[in-house]
């Protein structure tokens, strides 16, 4: 766990890459998670460089990064000092990086909504993309599948 913690700290401490052509993120996931791989493909297709790391103690990483339990999903990523939890659409990660709202530690799609990026489904669910930080959360966008509706 110490090695993973050191890797996370080193990755988050690197100079912001908002000016880089290809935003780079590190994704922590279970080796057996198929939807995580589909979400990673979604991010790559939308111009992100992704470094994936299979870990055995994902909950410990979430705790270390301050992911609220109620926002937990199957994978956790870090990019430019922000946490990305779950099946967040690439457009909202870009928006987070562009807007950089004060006091925000990360963005999340709690659970695993059907139709969200990485969760293909015949019928897509409506779900919220939330920002979180300092013990609070707020809606950032609302989607049905991969289509933003609010």
Features from the language model and the residues they span:
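Bacterial N-terminal signal peptides
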Residues: 2-15
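Local sequence-structure signature of Cys/Sec-based thiol-disulfide redox active-site neighborhoods
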Residues: 20-46
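Short active-site oxyanion
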Residues: 24-25, 48-50, 80-83
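Active-site-proximal beta-strand/loop segments in catalytic clefts of secreted hydrolases
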Residues: 28-30, 53-56, 87, 110-112
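Stable alpha-helical elements in mature extracytoplasmic
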Residues: 32, 39, 54-57, 89-93
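Conserved helix-turn-beta segment immediately C-terminal to the redox Cys motif
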Residues: 40-60
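Thiol/selenol-based redox catalytic cores and closely related redox-interacting motifs
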Residues: 64-150
């Amino acid at each position: 766990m110490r090695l993973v913690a050191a890797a996370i700290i080193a990755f988050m401490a690197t100079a912001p890459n908002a000016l880089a052509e290809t935003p780079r993120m590190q994704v922590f996931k279970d080796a057996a998670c198929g939807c995580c791989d589909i979400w990673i493909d979604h991010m790559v297709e939308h111009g992100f460089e992704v470094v994936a790391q299979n870990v055995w103690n994902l909950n410990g990483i979430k705790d270390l990064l301050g992911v609220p339990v109620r926002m937990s999903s199957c994978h956790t990523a870090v990019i430019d000092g922000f946490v990305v939890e779950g099946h967040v659409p690439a457009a909202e990660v870009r928006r987070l990086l562009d807007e950089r709202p004060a006091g925000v530690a990360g963005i999340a799609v709690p659970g695993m909504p059907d139709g969200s990026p990485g969760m293909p489904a015949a019928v897509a669910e409506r779900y919220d993309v939330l920002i979180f930080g300092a013990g609070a959360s707020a809606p950032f966008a609302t989607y049905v599948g991969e289509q933003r509706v609010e």
